[in-house]
Amino acid sequence: MRAYLDLLQRVVDEGVPKGDRTGTGTLSVFGHQMRFDLRAGFPLVTTKKVHTRSVFGELLWFLRGDTNVKWLQDRGITIWDEWADEQGDLGPVYGYQWRSWPTPDGRHVDQIAQVVEQIRDSPDSRRHVVSAWNVADIPDMALAPCHTMFQFYVAPPGPGEESGPGRLSCQLYQRSADVFLGVPFNIASYALLTHMVAQVTGLEVGDFVHTLGDAHLYSNHLDQARLQLTREPRPLPRLVLDSSVTELDAFDLEHIAVEGYDPHPGIKAPIAV
């Protein structure tokens, strides 16, 4: 995970002071890209402990099309509580856009089902894209999408693998990236999604490419970032998915595990709401 530490170091060294919606203040850089070979291990930050149950549960919640925090809370996951209303609702956020994008004629598009079908039927298509950035719905969202759009790419088998399956890669564009708290979650979440989609489409995994727009450290995360930068990365863990799961909607928390995760201790930091 040296790529993540390089990002952290870049923001500390080159970030410019900027105000922000929360009033906290940030150091910010614009435009950064990281690439992770998913065959080399599961890209889970090791220089601090990441709460994997929250990462995995949040992704499953998105894939359910859910926009109420109750499902998360029932599983001990509270990462969205600060933005929910009294009924636990968040408005038409990620899950709604992924699974039920509204059309002008009153229909809804299940982008996730559509992209899985496209990967199976037309792997060479350049339209394997899912977007959460629905301009018309943003005013009704508790929080505008930070990770806005992702695209899958199917590469043919490499040299010596002519008879094997292709490799599935994913690129995420993230318009707003909380480098200390959010980005480690985002990397692991989309790496997991790539593994899951690869499994249900009969492919191997390739790369996860993470492209960031405004990559920032909040002013009250700077000491924590500097502490993290003193730590040496440890070997990446291995992701284990239950091989009996053949449809994306069938995945549950019990089907997802990591082996060999040996991180440095966690580093607490306040979340900017």
Curated annotation (Swiss-Prot):
Its family remark reads:
Belongs to the thymidylate synthase family. Bacterial-type ThyA subfamily.
| Subunit and interaction comment | Homodimer.
Database matches in SUPFAM superfamilies? Thymidylate synthase/dCMP hydroxymethylase (SSF55831)
Q: Which residues participate in (6R)-5,10-methylene-5,6,7,8-tetrahydrofolate binding?
A: H51, D178, A272
| Pathway terms, separated by semicolons | Pyrimidine metabolism; dTTP biosynthesis
Gene Ontology BP terms: dTMP biosynthetic process; dTTP biosynthetic process; methylation
What Pfam families does the record point to?
A: Thymidylat_synt
Catalytic reactions on record: dUMP + (6R)-5,10-methylene-5,6,7,8-tetrahydrofolate = 7,8-dihydrofolate + dTMP
Per the UniProt entry, what species is this protein from, by scientific name? Nocardioides sp. (strain ATCC BAA-499 / JS614)
| Cell compartments where the protein resides | Cytoplasm
General function of this protein: Catalyzes the reductive methylation of 2'-deoxyuridine-5'-monophosphate (dUMP) to 2'-deoxythymidine-5'-monophosphate (dTMP) while utilizing 5,10-methylenetetrahydrofolate (mTHF) as the methyl donor and reductant in the reaction, yielding dihydrofolate (DHF) as a by-product. This enzymatic reaction provides an intracellular de novo source of dTMP, an essential precursor for DNA biosynthesis.
An annotated GO cellular component: cytosol
Official protein name in the record: Thymidylate synthase
Q: What is its EC number?
A: 2.1.1.45
Q: Which UniProt keywords apply?
A: Cytoplasm, Methyltransferase, Nucleotide biosynthesis, Transferase
The enzyme's first-digit EC class, named in words, is: transferase
**Gene encoding this chain?**
thyA
GO molecular function of the protein, one example? thymidylate synthase activity
InterPro entries hit by this protein:
Thymidate_synth/dCMP_Mease, Thymidate_synth/dCMP_Mease_dom, Thymidate_synth/dCMP_Mease_sf, Thymidylate_synthase, Thymidylate_synthase_AS
Q: Where is the active site?
A: C146 (nucleophile)
Q: Which residues bind dUMP?
A: R21, R126, R127, R175, S176, A177, D178, N186, H216, L217, Y218
Listed transmembrane segments: none
The answer to whether keyword Transmembrane applies is no
